[in-house]
């Protein structure tokens, strides 16, 4: 196939070089257009007239002339094929000449080649390809071999389905099919044609048979040295038209039991039928149809089973192991997240413990500095040489009982109080304090904790100044009150000033 395409490209390049070397003159173009116009205007003209007009074209090569079209039809026409030839071919193939003549106004030259590389003639356009009957597929129509070999049309271009035209071969088609119909006539239509041929029923016209060549050998297609098309890379072969609707698969392959334990609850499988290790492929096709099954189906039929049981079980085991690993990873991640939360809580607990330790240390410092002094005992500061010992109760303590150190402040001695308490059956802590330890009554004219009574002393003036400074009065009024306080001399005036100041502050 690659050699044929290279040969076609070479012929096209030669045609282009010939046109560049000897450009077509305007006179030759006008004569050619006039000849084609006469052919379209005179349907009864024979082939000889067409050949004479063709010979009259000065210096035009055959492949170059096939590209010249009529201005009236708007599309190129086939060289050397008049309406008379079209009528003859139409009558031979059983097609009415009226329809063929109506469709011949916009014909375009196409060339089709079979698998042997020989050109198939008798083509009008892509929508009405008619091929003469013949078993060898080498029928000849008008145009000659030179025209088909030197054509500048690229036959190797793939169609919309990715197959080249040379892969399709040549097949005489019945009168009800066109070229586009052959590409889409799959399945039931081809099957019906094959059934009619096998039963011996001939087509309406003699010599009309459907001969589909066998598919090309994949080994031959893969031997090309340089790839022609980038899509196939010259290593994939076309296997014809695949009829997927006529193929029926066999039994479904069974899967082996997985050795791993299922993660979820299982389902009963008592009603499951027994498995089938292998089943042959059921197909409905004949070797003469030209339709082949897919390469995968052929390899599976030759090799045996669709899947290797051991490989399939290994893949399933690997998938199960990966799923188990993923599940374990998810559990580990969840535990790590919980650990992170616990870490934050532990940090907060540590901070609280540190704060409590600081508070306890502060309390211990305060408790160690507490001293309870008991009056009446101790050394006289004026007589440091006295033989009086320190009171043992003079030590850091938190509290003491209410009866301790009362003997030193009462009038009666301790021995007499104990004897009297024993005779009465109870110990009495009541007694009269000595005069030196008794509190004197509070005087109303002297400053005490009960109230402030100003006098002419400097202490009273200092207290009044502190009251003025700590008040919420304005600065101007504070300065004014300070000036008045300095001017006051008597005790009565100072007492009145104090009363006035308290009224101003309390407002």
UniProtKB/Swiss-Prot annotation:
Key words, A-Z: Phosphoprotein, Viral RNA replication
X domain (XD) as annotated region, ranges: 457-507
Region entry Interaction with the L polymerase, spans: 361-377, 396-410
Residue stretches in coiled coil: none
Keyword Iron-sulfur among UniProt keywords: no
Annotated region described as Disordered, given as residue ranges: 40-92, 133-168, 201-228, 252-273
Compositionally skewed regions (Acidic residues) per UniProt: 144-160
Disulphide bonds in the chain: none
An example Gene Ontology molecular-function term: RNA binding
Region feature Multimerization, mapped onto this chain: 304-376
Region of interest called Interaction with the nucleocapsid (N-RNA), as start-end residue ranges on this chain: 459-507
Annotated Gene3D superfamilies: 1.20.5.110, DNA helicase RuvA subunit, C-terminal domain
One Pfam family, short name: Paramyxo_P_V_N
PTM: Phosphorylation on serines by host CK2 is necessary for the formation of viral factories.
SUPFAM superfamilies: Phosphoprotein XD domain (SSF101089)
Positions of the UniProt region annotated as Interaction with N0: 1-48
Recorded domain comment: The N-terminus consists of a long intrinsically disordered tail. The central part contains the coiled-coil multimerization domain (MD or OD). Forms a four-stranded coiled coil structure. The C-terminus constitutes the alpha-helical X domain (XD) that binds to the nucleocapsid (N-RNA complex) and the L polymerase.
Similarity comment text for this entry: Belongs to the morbillivirus P protein family.
Role description: Essential cofactor of the RNA polymerase L that plays a central role in the transcription and replication by forming the polymerase complex with RNA polymerase L and recruiting L to the genomic N-RNA template for RNA synthesis. Also plays a central role in the encapsidation of nascent RNA chains by forming the encapsidation complex with the nucleocapsid protein N (N-P complex). Acts as a chaperone for newly synthesized free N protein, so-called N0, allowing encapsidation of nascent RNA chains during replication.
Subunit structure: Homotetramer. Interacts (via multimerization domain and XD domain) with polymerase L; this interaction forms the polymerase L-P complex. Interacts (via N-terminus) with N0 (via Ncore); this interaction allows P to chaperon N0 to avoid N polymerization and non-specific RNA binding before encapsidation. Interacts (via C-terminus) with N-RNA template (via Ntail); this interaction maintains the P/L complex anchored to the nucleocapsid template during the sequential transcription. Interacts (via C-terminus) with protein C this interaction allows C to associate with the ribonucleocapsid.
Descriptive protein name: Phosphoprotein
